[in-house]
């Protein structure tokens, strides 16, 4: 039923070879296996070695995590080292096309306050940038929402969205993310976006050993007591306060359809022709 309801490849999420084989045998078309890695090495008894013949037999693409025998790769050089090993192994030993390899450089929470997590988002973004430079045809993916773990829902949406935008700019091809947990960049207030960027790139400021600006502390302040609903209501109020023609453009930019029909009726009542609404106002927002 799944195979006939979409033209997109279905992702089978398991590290157990028997589960993957059962899924592949019941699905028509090509699938994506999530995932392979070197957590228990690449020897004959490793999960990697047991999954690959199944993937090869069924022509599946593969999500490959930057995890090796030492653990989950945190800094960019470690991520790149594991990624290069995966790509080399998958292409030379197993004959997998680079376009069928989807590298996950891993996302870690950056709001824990622990020193060792401060640069995790930056390291992931830069690893993606370098990886796409070295292997342009290799695909990349990330589980985006891990980056904001521990924050309140409103803060998570903003951090997820800004992090995703930065990763895409660095070359990210796809993402594992719930659509309700991100928002268009145009909807994010400038101050929230700036501090989120400071947090992602660890732009702390110091006077000697004293931290004079901590983006994490500032980010927490910005969202103290803020709920997703109140954040949306605030944006709706700001939108409603704009002049009609600016409001029409802003609705297009933000992808905000709630209230659009009323604004169009108001524009017609104000004597603006349908053609003018489209050419002079709606198209301006595209």
Language-model regions, residue ranges each:
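Rossmann-like NAD(P)(H) cofactor-binding subdomain of soluble oxidoreductases
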Residues: 14
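ATP-dependent carboxylate/acyl-activation modules
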Residues: 1-9, 17-104, 108-141, 145-285
